[in-house]
């Protein structure tokens, strides 16, 4: 049974405008990335050939996950409580910790499905939570 559904869309240019462009060292000081990404995700952001697109997709995925939890970001759920990764085939995965994991348990959720898509100007994500 579906216990949560969330979707989000992000304009990639808005995210790219908040990323320093002076090289790899500048990426290390990106405040938005530090606020949104976990340490593991941040390392991949810095190594990415398209850091703006990477961050936009992760931002959309985390917002979609928070909406599926019924809280949005806030109310005990932070960006740091939601981690986006990829399986060996490249499919996106979402993992919950701390407040996000507690909220998932309150909903009776046990599985999360994540889809991320991007085009030239936008990144979008959808999360479905199942019991």
Swiss-Prot record:
Gene3D superfamilies: 4'-phosphopantetheinyl transferase domain (3.90.470.20). One of its GO terms (biological process) is fatty acid biosynthetic process. It comes from the Bacteria. The keyword Translocase does not apply. The keyword Magnesium applies. GO terms for molecular function: holo-[acyl-carrier-protein] synthase activity; magnesium ion binding. It is an enzyme of class 2 (transferase). Its cofactor is Mg(2+). Keywords: Cytoplasm, Fatty acid biosynthesis, Fatty acid metabolism, Lipid biosynthesis, Lipid metabolism, Magnesium, Metal-binding, Transferase. Coiled coil: none annotated. It catalyses: apo-[ACP] + CoA = holo-[ACP] + adenosine 3',5'-bisphosphate + H(+). Mg(2+) binds at residues 8, 63. Pfam families: ACPS. It is found in: Cytoplasm. InterPro entries: 4-PPantetheinyl_Trfase_dom, 4-PPantetheinyl_Trfase_dom_sf, ACPS, Ppantetheine-prot_Trfase_dom. GO terms for cellular component: cytoplasm. Its EC number is 2.7.8.7. Its main location: cytoplasm. HAMAP family: AcpS. Transfers the 4'-phosphopantetheine moiety from coenzyme A to a Ser of acyl-carrier-protein. Belongs to the P-Pant transferase superfamily. AcpS family. This is Holo-[acyl-carrier-protein] synthase. It comes from Shewanella halifaxensis (strain HAW-EB4).
